[in-house]
Amino acid sequence: EQPEEMYQTLAALSSQGPAAYDGAPGGFVHSAAAAAAAAAAASSPVYVPTTRVGSMLPGLPYLQGAGSGPANHAGGAGSHPGWPQASADSPPYGSGGGTAGGGAAGPGSAGSAAAHVSARFPYSPSPPMANGAARDPGGYAAAGGGGAGGVSGGSGGGLAAMGSREHQYSSLSAARPLNGTYHHHHHHHPSAYSPYVGAPLTPAWPAGPFETPVLHSLQSRAGAPLPVPRGPSADLLEDLPESRECVNCGSIQTPLWRRDGTGHYLCNRCGLYSKMNGLSGPLIKPQKPVPSSRRLGLSCANCHTTTTTLWRRNAEGEPVCNACGLYMKLHGVPRPLAMKKEGIQTRKRKPKSINKSKACSGNSNNSVPMTPTSTSSNSDDCSKNTSPTTQTPASGAGASVMSGTGESANPENSELKYSGQDGLYIGVSLASPAEVTSSVRQDSWCALALA
């Protein structure tokens, strides 16, 4: 009854914490072995330091009842005990059927023991560790459930020889995850188990057949400096209306922000223009109003006036009024102060009706070639305007003009023509020479006669 209670205590203690290793080189002592020594010494489980386990181990009841074998050796030389697999027909500890070897631990010698695992704890045994090596997390449950540990005593003890380790580890590799390399050719070679500090951490994912401690270390290193994801604050800054600007006109204030085909922001005016016409709006940047403080104290540097339609600058960069600026530009000298006026003089433009009358008068000056029909018609008009007493000379004058045009070489006809013209002018009875000139200009045949 006592061994079964002790095994239950060992299983409970093995699931609580990792193994405690002995400081002596060449071996280690599991916490389960320490708890077993404490259970044998007292009825209640009391923690016993690992340095005392070597002297208390020969007094364990289940080791004394087991058959002894030639496992005693000196200086770490001798045959290494076997690490059998767990089987259902293996007898429990204390039954006398196990193959456990024991020896008294003395100075310079080490004793090792192994036993079959009981069917009550079907866990795979844990292989021996090298000097100063740590154990992987998967090995604690196996060692705490039913694995046998080796005990070393004295200062010069080492691990046993590696005679039958190769074929035993090959059978263990099928049931255990390949977290390390089990094949060692010398006991001074370090183990490939990943070292740990403090309590072992259970991996978040199940161990695969190709996972190694190097891979886990690379994953832990790569996962440590994780890049900080972009928070929503950066997106919020882009959505703020103060940070937006129209890509077309550069406006930063609009009642409604729109987007073009490429996703850029447009103000309401440019967005509507682009939507309706399919083109970008005219690049009219909003004119910023000049502050009133700049306009209030502004005065002309030449005449010191404060009212002008356009402010200009002189060669020195000083503000001048429009009149002084134009005067300096045209004449090259400053505008005299005597020319200063209180009001603003605007340009006097002529009405458009005068221009039209000038165009009509210019067209009337053009001479029109006279034909016989036009001459007769004009002569008839003139005869109508004359009095009845002068009607006959007027008709004679018309005939003389026709004859004069046809026979210009005859001097008599020319004299008759001029005499007829004199009679014509007398019959019209014009008052002043100005009136005569105006009447001549109105009739085309009179202009030809004066030529």
UniProtKB/Swiss-Prot annotation:
Locations of Polar residues compositional bias? Answer: 356-394, 402-413
User: In UniProt terms, what function does this protein have?
Assistant: Transcriptional activator that regulates SEMA3C and PLXNA2. May regulate genes that protect epithelial cells from bacterial infection. Involved in gene regulation specifically in the gastric epithelium. Involved in bone morphogenetic protein (BMP)-mediated cardiac-specific gene expression. Binds to BMP response element (BMPRE) DNA sequences within cardiac activating regions.
What ranges of residues constitute the GATA-type zinc fingers? Answer: 246-270, 300-324
Region spans: Disordered: 69-111, 338-416
Per UniProt, what is one Pfam family of this protein? GATA
Oligomeric form and interacting partners: Interacts with LMCD1.
User: Which subcellular locations apply to this protein?
Assistant: Nucleus
Q: Which domain of life is it from?
A: Eukaryota
Write the protein's name.
Answer: Transcription factor GATA-6
Write the lineage as a comma-separated list.
Answer: Eukaryota, Metazoa, Chordata, Craniata, Vertebrata
Q: Which GO terms describe its biological process?
A: cell fate commitment; epithelial cell differentiation; heart development; negative regulation of transcription by RNA polymerase II; positive regulation of DNA-templated transcription; positive regulation of transcription by RNA polymerase II
- Mark out the compositionally biased spans (Basic residues): 346-355
The annotated regions of Gly residues compositional bias extend over 94-109
Q: Which InterPro entries match?
A: GATA_N, TF_GATA_4/5/6, Transcription_factor_GATA, Znf_GATA, Znf_NHR/GATA
Protein source organism? Sus scrofa (Pig)
